[in-house]
């Protein structure tokens, strides 16, 4: 069992996103507990290429995409590895949840360890709109919070 965690960046949004994978062939469970976001909203989160936050969340680079795919929904065959989709917030702007993901890995060559988890200001359109950013970023907006994914105790 490998466990990893990413914590907030520099904004009012805080919380943790944890990753757990039993073995190299198992799906990864992604769990989140996020506070301080917009109330009653769907907000995007993705794993980005670099574990570099020297210039805030901007230096995390594009979505983690080792297979050269277009942006998509977590359940799509054609998607970036880092495409986690959206989470829903409650009336206070908090979100708690989990999902399993077959492409997110903590073990192997395409591991997300050392990369950055970014929480976006907008909703991921899942690559389904006509917006020029849709097939690249999901048109998910700014990056108000992020954290490097590191090995958890």
Curated annotation (Swiss-Prot):
First-listed, main subcellular location of the protein, grouped into a coarse class: cytoplasm
- What is the protein's known function? Destroys radicals which are normally produced within the cells and which are toxic to biological systems.
One GO molecular function term? superoxide dismutase activity
Cofactor: how bound: Binds 1 copper ion per subunit.
Q: How does it assemble?
A: Homodimer.
Q: Which residues form a coiled coil?
A: none
Q: Where does Cu cation bind?
A: 46, 48, 63, 120
The UniProt family comment states: Belongs to the Cu-Zn superoxide dismutase family.
Q: Which reaction does it catalyse?
A: 2 superoxide + 2 H(+) = H2O2 + O2
Identify the cofactor(s). Answer: Cu cation; Zn(2+)
Q: Where is the composition biased (Basic and acidic residues)?
A: 68-80, 124-136
Which PROSITE patterns does UniProt cross-reference here?
Answer: SOD_CU_ZN_1 (PS00087), SOD_CU_ZN_2 (PS00332)
Query: What organism is recorded for this protein?
Result: Aspergillus flavus
Q: Name one GO biological process term.
A: cell redox homeostasis
**Residues annotated as binding substrate:** 143
UniProt name for this protein: Superoxide dismutase [Cu-Zn]
């Amino acid at each position: 069992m490998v466990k990893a965690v990413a914590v907030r960046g520099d904004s009012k949004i805080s919380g943790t996103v944890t990753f757990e994978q039993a073995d190299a062939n198992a799906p990864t469970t992604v769990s989140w507990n996020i506070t301080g976001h917009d109330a009653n909203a769907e907000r995007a989160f993705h794993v980005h290429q670099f574990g570099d936050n020297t210039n805030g969340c901007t230096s995390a680079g594009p979505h983690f995409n080792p297979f050269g795919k277009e942006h998509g929904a977590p359940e799509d065959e054609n998607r970036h590895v880092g495409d986690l989709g959206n989470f829903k917030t409650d009336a206070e702007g908090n979100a708690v949840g989990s999902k399993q993901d077959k492409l997110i890995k903590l073990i192997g060559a395409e591991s997300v360890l050392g990369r950055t988890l970014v929480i976006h200001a907008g909703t991921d359109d899942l690559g389904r709109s006509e917006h020029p950013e849709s097939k690249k970023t999901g048109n998910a907006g700014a990056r108000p919070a992020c954290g490097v994914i590191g090995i958890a105790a």
